[in-house]
């Protein structure tokens, strides 16, 4: 048969074109529609039809073409194009009706196929678009999942760090509360001891006052007298002057002048001594304030070693000077001078010891709460033994001074002076005593005024200390936020910082701390307000200063005392609660009650009283 090509009808071509445009114009892409239109309109209709018919059917092969079409249609299940003949020999004729019916069926099938093809193409386009959309959604969700995982890991790490910081802060708060409780107990014990000392001093003062009144104010009992028999004359042979009223009056005037001069001289000495003691006390106050001030230098090991050697040498010097044999032969001035020197040296010892402990505590805080440096057991025992020896010597020196004063009072009053003093009850003496009493009251008022101003200054320092603590807390919180090691975006960082600090401006995160002349540093903080109480309540004699340190040697082999100033808060007018950090590093064999006894005895010299005389 040869190669045959499909015969296309021009009418069918136009119908197919219209049908395809009708069914798939909205579903197909513009490029496909354009290409279809170009293919359909590329050649004129007459030329196309002529070329197709010239290729498939010609005037010579009409019968063959019809028979071929009939065979093809019958194979596809269509009825035959020829009419059935009654006789076999008769020639079959072409049935126009069958041909038209077949053509109609073919057109219907073609339309159905085109519709199905269009629906399939539309469905494929929908599925393709859905697939692209799902793939894009899948990529976006995958990226979001990775970002959320990274953010979750960073938040978990941040949460862990915050929990660790919170635990550390809770532990610090607990330690601070314990220190506050200990310091309150120490203050109470000091107050009771101060009250007892004041009562004892008042009793001694009353006794001395009564003794002076008996010696000076009482009249002479004229009924009791003694006459001298067998009077021995003078060596030169002269007679003694008769005792007349004039001579007795002149002698009494001379006696009163001598007494007045003696009293004035004693008053000057007492004023000078008070001035010296005030200078010493003021110096001790300044040193205590500078010691517990917020401006703490960095700890220096060499300086600590040098101060330690100075402390040992001072203790040895005190031990050499205040010997037991030399105290009995010393005068009051020498004893007073040595007392002043010993108090100064003891204060230097206390200052160096507190500075050493303070430097150790600051070093521990700066190194991130590492193991605390503890004084060795042997050094502690040696220091406590030296302190005990010094305390004993001071006690003996005080006893010797009291005995010397009593001896002077006893020897000053002989028979002649007592007989003369009993007759010197005069109005001028009363007026002089009244003047002295008024002077004493003025001094008392001045002292009360100074104490009030000192208390107000301490309260102001406490308020400033509180404000500084608030600023320091905000600064520490912002420093903690700046220490995070996660690299978020800038907007996220701003949001996080604004959530914690209440401001999204990065400039607000920088805190400039105030000068540290008034307020101390923290996690180990200074105590500027408590210095007023410490300095105001410092002991004025070795009997008040030394016994406070006598109990340090008890249980000394098993404990070491560490003092670090921490914090003060004003409670009432004239009273403040001092917060100092007292920590005891005990060895495994130490007793539980060692710390309480040592700390209470060590701080028993610090007392406070509002109703001073």
Curated annotation (Swiss-Prot):
Q: Where in the cell is it found?
A: Cell junction, Adherens junction; Nucleus; Cytoplasm, Cytoskeleton, Microtubule organizing center, Centrosome, Centriolar satellite; Cytoplasm, Cytoskeleton, Cilium basal body
- Biological process according to GO: actin cytoskeleton organization; cell adhesion; centrosome cycle; cilium assembly; intraciliary transport involved in cilium assembly; regulation of cell motility; regulation of Rac protein signal transduction
For this chain, one GO molecular function annotation is: protein-macromolecule adaptor activity
According to the UniProt record, one GO cellular component term is:
nucleus
Judging by the UniProt lineage, the source's domain of life is: Eukaryota
Q: Which UniProt keywords apply?
A: Cell adhesion, Cell junction, Cell projection, Cilium biogenesis/degradation, Coiled coil, Cytoplasm, Cytoskeleton, Nucleus, Phosphoprotein
Query: Its function?
Result: Acts as a centrosome maturation factor, probably by maintaining the integrity of the pericentriolar material and proper microtubule nucleation at mitotic spindle poles. The function seems to implicate at least in part WRAP73; the SSX2IP:WRAP73 complex is proposed to act as regulator of spindle anchoring at the mitotic centrosome. Involved in cell movement: localizes at the leading edge of moving cells in response to PDGF and is required for the formation of the leading edge and the promotion of cell movement, possibly via activation of Rac signaling.
**Family per similarity comment:** Belongs to the ADIP family.
Please give the subunit comment from the record: Interacts with SSX2 and SSX3. Does not interact with SSX1 and SSX4. Interacts with VAV2. Interacts with afadin and alpha-actinin. Interacts with WRAP73.
Protein name (Swiss-Prot/TrEMBL): Afadin- and alpha-actinin-binding protein
Give the organism, scientific name: Rattus norvegicus
């Amino acid at each position: 048969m040869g190669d045959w090509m499909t015969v296309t009808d021009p009418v069918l071509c136009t119908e197919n074109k219209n049908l395809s445009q009708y069914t798939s114009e909205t579903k197909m892409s513009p490029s496909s529609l354009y290409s279809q239109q170009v293919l359909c309109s590329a050649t004129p209709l007459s030329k196309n039809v002529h070329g197709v018919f010239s290729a498939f059917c010609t005037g010579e092969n009409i019968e063959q073409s019809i028979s071929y079409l009939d065979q093809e249609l019958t194979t596809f299940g269509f009825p035959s194009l020829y009419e059935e003949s009654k006789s076999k020999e008769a020639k079959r004729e072409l049935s126009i009706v069958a041909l038209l019916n077949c053509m109609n069926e073919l057109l219907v099938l073609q339309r159905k196929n085109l519709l199905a093809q269009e629906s399939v193409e539309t469905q494929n386009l929908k599925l393709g678009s859905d697939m692209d959309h799902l793939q894009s959604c899948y990529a976006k969700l995958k990226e979001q999942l990775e970002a959320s995982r990274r953010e979750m890991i960073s938040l978990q790490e941040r949460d862990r760090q915050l929990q660790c910081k919170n635990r550390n802060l809770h532990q610090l708060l607990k330690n601070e509360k314990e220190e506050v409780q200990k310091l309150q107990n120490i203050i109470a014990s000091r107050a009771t001891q101060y009250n007892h000392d004041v009562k004892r001093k008042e009793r001694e003062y009353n006794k001395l006052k009564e003794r002076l009144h008996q010696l000076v104010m009482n009249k002479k009992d004229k009924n009791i007298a003694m006459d001298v028999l067998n009077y021995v004359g003078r060596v030169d042979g002269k007679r003694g002057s008769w005792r007349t009223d004039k001579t007795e009056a002149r002698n009494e005037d001379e006696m009163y002048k001598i007494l007045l001069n003696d009293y004035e001289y004693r008053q000057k000495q007492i004023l000078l001594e008070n001035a010296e003691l005030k200078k010493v006390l003021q110096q001790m106050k300044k040193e205590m304030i500078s010691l517990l001030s917020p401006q703490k230098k960095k700890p220096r090991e060499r300086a600590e070693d040098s101060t330690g050697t100075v402390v040992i040498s001072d203790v040895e010097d005190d031990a050499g000077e205040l010997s037991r044999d030399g105290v009995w032969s010393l005068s009051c001035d020498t004893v007073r001078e040595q007392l002043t020197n010993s108090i100064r040296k003891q204060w230097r010892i206390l200052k160096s010891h507190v500075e050493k402990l303070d430097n150790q505590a600051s070093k521990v805080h700066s190194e991130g709460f590492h193991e605390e440096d503890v004084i060795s057991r042997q050094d502690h025992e040696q220091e406590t033994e030296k302190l005990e020896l010094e305390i004993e010597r001071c006690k003996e020196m005080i006893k010797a001074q009291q005995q010397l004063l009593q001896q002077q009072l006893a020897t000053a009053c002989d028979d002649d002076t007592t007989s003369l003093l009993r007759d010197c009850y005069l109005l001028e003496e009363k007026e002089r005593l009244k003047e002295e009493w008024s002077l004493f009251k003025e001094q008392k008022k001045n002292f009360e005024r100074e104490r009030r101003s000192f208390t107000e200054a301490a309260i102001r320092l406490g308020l400033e200390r509180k404000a500084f603590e608030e600023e320091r807390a905000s600064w520490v919180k912002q420093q903690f936020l700046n220490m995070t090691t996660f690299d978020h975006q800038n907007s996220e960082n701003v949001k996080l910082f604004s959530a914690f600090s209440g401001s999204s401006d990065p400039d607000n995160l920088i805190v400039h701390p105030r000068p540290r002349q008034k307020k101390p540093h923290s996690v180990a903080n200074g105590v500027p307000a408590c210095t007023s109480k410490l300095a105001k309540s410092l002991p004025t004699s070795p009997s008040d200063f030394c016994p406070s340190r006598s109990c340090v040697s008890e249980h000394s082999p098993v404990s070491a005392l560490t003092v670090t100033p921490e914090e003060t808060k004003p409670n009432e007018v004239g009273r403040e609660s001092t917060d100092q950090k007292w920590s005891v590093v005990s060895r495994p064999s130490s007793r539980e009650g060692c710390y309480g006894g040592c700390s209470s005895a060590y701080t028993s010299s610090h007392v406070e009283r509002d109703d001073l005389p």
